Amino acid sequence: MPRQLSAAAVLFASLAVILHDGSQMRAKAFPKTRDYSQPTAAATGQDIAKPVQQPANQAPHQTLAARLMDGHITFQTAATIKTPTTTPVTTKNTPTTSPIIYTLVTTQATSNNSHTAPPLTKVTVGPSLAPYSLPPTITPPAHTTGTSSSTVNHTTGNATQPSNQTTLPATLSIAPHKSTTGQKPVQPTHAPGTTAAAHNTTRTAAPASTVPGSTLAPQPSSIKTGIYQVLNGSRLCIKAEMGIQLIVQDKESVFSPRRYFNLDPNATQASGNCGTRNSNLLLNFQGGFVNLTFTKDEGSYYISEVGACLTVSDPETIYQGMKHAVVMFQTVVGHSFKCVSEQSLQLSAHLQLKTTNVQLQAFDFEDDHFGNVDECSSDYTIVLPVIGAIVVGLCLVGMGVYKIRLRCQSSGYQRI
């Protein structure tokens, strides 16, 4: 009986010692629930994973696994690192049909890192966890990945364990997801000097400015006389009083009908230039112009060149002509030339210029008045016949009177 009591006491003492030692080992193995925001790993890994700074809008998805090695527990962090895309698209992640399993071993993170490690998921390992049971699976929620230009390099290290240790790998099971990518339309790139889009442009060309044509008269009419002057500063250079008419013919035949255009002094502008030996008078009107060039030669001057242009509106036709090396209206320097009779000059086969009631002077002026008048010979040819006709008429009248008187005298002598 005493031996049985002593044996029972020894047995209870042994059980007490075994239970005491077991509770100490359990307390050492699981002292408390740790915050694994900075876990340490006892494994002798050769590769050190670089800490990755994740975007602020993404929550880390991590799983902790417990490794039992000779009574020591080594905690490893299995992290899922989402590599952002570098293309500007919006990606929506939904569950796919095939699971992807990553086995990552992350070694101890140093405290000298400048970035703040994101919080990790806490796992409490209790006595009820079986030695070879797998940790719970963390399934990341569906999220939307934004645009990012950074690239993350993953370094996965396989820890080398002693042969007498049993390793429980940390397994991260990512739930199947389906990736649906919606791309925004790419904007076209415009290269210099090229047009990316076709532009339908309707351009309306402005009508070309046309000079209103002149209206021709089928029959000649009285020509108005205008006064035209050209000044050299304040001094008078050219002064002309005359009427001008332009005559056009569509055909060179003498039987071709003529049409007439008279210059209106009120609608004509005079301009020109003055020189020591050459001066010109330019008369501009609606639908054309007339240009007269004066040349001074020793003690006389004359018109050496005549040009004209006329545009007809109905039908639209341009008549122009030029006469060079002519001597017209020649007179002495300081005198004015006067020609009342009509003078004609053929400028081209279809254009003729006619002047009437002309009195003009160029170069030397005294005050603003014409000098001594030199008349054209054509004026004399008109006056002489008139004078002759008058003389002849007077002679006829005298002879008639004389005959009448003779008859009267002869009749008186017969009565006596």
Curated annotation (Swiss-Prot):
- Disordered: where is this region? 135-217
Enumerate the InterPro entries for this protein. Lamp2-like_luminal (IPR048528), Lysosome-assoc_membr_glycop (IPR002000)
The entry's localization annotation reads: Cell surface; Lysosome membrane; Cytoplasmic vesicle membrane; Early endosome membrane
* Domain of life (superkingdom): Eukaryota
Q: Which residues lie on this side of the membrane: Lumenal?
A: 28-381
Signal peptide per UniProt: 1-27
Composition bias, kind Polar residues: at what positions? 142-170
Q: Does the keyword Cell cycle apply?
A: no
Pfam families for this protein: Lamp2-like_luminal (PF01299)
Protein's job? Lysosomal membrane glycoprotein which plays a role in the unfolded protein response (UPR) that contributes to protein degradation and cell survival during proteasomal dysfunction. Plays a role in the process of fusion of the lysosome with the autophagosome, thereby modulating the autophagic process. Promotes hepatocellular lipogenesis through activation of the PI3K/Akt pathway. May also play a role in dendritic cell function and in adaptive immunity.
Which family does the similarity line name?
A: Belongs to the LAMP family.
Would you tell me the protein name for this molecule? Lysosome-associated membrane glycoprotein 3
Q: Name the source organism.
A: Macaca mulatta
Q: Which gene encodes it?
A: LAMP3
